Curated annotation (Swiss-Prot):
One of its GO terms (molecular function) is geranylgeranylglycerol-phosphate geranylgeranyltransferase activity. Pathway: Membrane lipid metabolism; glycerophospholipid metabolism. Prenyltransferase that catalyzes the transfer of the geranylgeranyl moiety of geranylgeranyl diphosphate (GGPP) to the C2 hydroxyl of (S)-3-O-geranylgeranylglyceryl phosphate (GGGP). This reaction is the second ether-bond-formation step in the biosynthesis of archaeal membrane lipids. This is Digeranylgeranylglyceryl phosphate synthase. Its cofactor is Mg(2+). It is a multi-pass membrane protein.
Amino acid sequence: MKSSLPGALFQRVADWLRLLRAGNCAVVSLGAYTGYVAGRGGSLPQGVLVAASAALVAAWGNIVNDYFDLESDAISKPWRPLPSRRISPGSAVSASLPLLAAGLALGFLVSPLCGFTAVLASALLFLYSWRVKALGLPGNVLIAFLAALNVVYGALASPEPWRSLLPSAYAFLIILGREVLKGVEDLEGDAARGVKTVASTLGARAALRVSAVLLLAVVALSPLPLLSGYGALYALFAFGGVDAPIALALLKAGPEPRRAWIATRILKVPLLMGLLAFLVGGLA
C-alpha cells in the first residue's frame, strides 16, 4: 500500500498539470516577458511579476476552457482529466478561482493599466470558451488576438510599450495562420457540429490559401526588426527558427486532414522561436 502512494501522488500532480496545460502557461509567461524586454524593461522582478500574472490568468483560462468542453471532450478526448473524472469539475472550478485572483492581483501590483488589461483578457478568455470558440473563424481571430495581447501586456510594464508591436504581430499572424489550418485538420467534425471555419465554409483548399497568406506575412515581417536595432541573434532565431519551419509546414500542408495535422504540429515551433528571437535579440 505504501509503495503505491508516490505513484498515486505523481498521477494526481500530472493530472493537474495537464488540466492547467503547464506547457502552454510557460509559453504565455515567455510571451509576456518577451513583450517586457521588447519594451526596454530592465527590472527582472518587474518582468517576472508580469510574466507570472499572465501565466496564472492563462492557467485559469485553460481550466475554464476544459470545463466548457467537458461534453465534447467526453467523446473526443476521454483521457483528459475532467472527462475521465480523475479531477471533478467542481474541484477544477474551485482551484481556478485562486489562480485568477492571484493573476489579477499581480497585474494590479505591476500597474493599474496592467491590472485592467488582465481583467479584459480574463473576460475575453471566458467569452472564448463559453461562446466564441464554437463560432469557428471568430474564435480563431479572438485566440490570435489574445496571443498578441499577451505580448503587449508584458510591454505595458515597460518604458516603451510600443516596441511590442512587431512581436505581437508575429504572435497574431502565426496563431491565426495555425488556427485556420487546424480547421482543415478538424474539417469533418466541425462540419458535423456546424462550426463555421474557413475550411468548413469555403473548403480545405481555400483555408490552405488563407493560412499561407498569414504565415508568409510573418516571413515578410522577419527582416523588419533588423532595421530597429535587433542583431545577429535575432536573425539566427527568426530566419532559422521561424521562417524555415513555416516554409516546411507550408510544404507539408495539404487538403487532407493528416497533412494538415502534420503542418499544425510543425507550426508550434515558429511561435516559440519567434518569441525567443525577440527575447534574445532584445537582451543582446
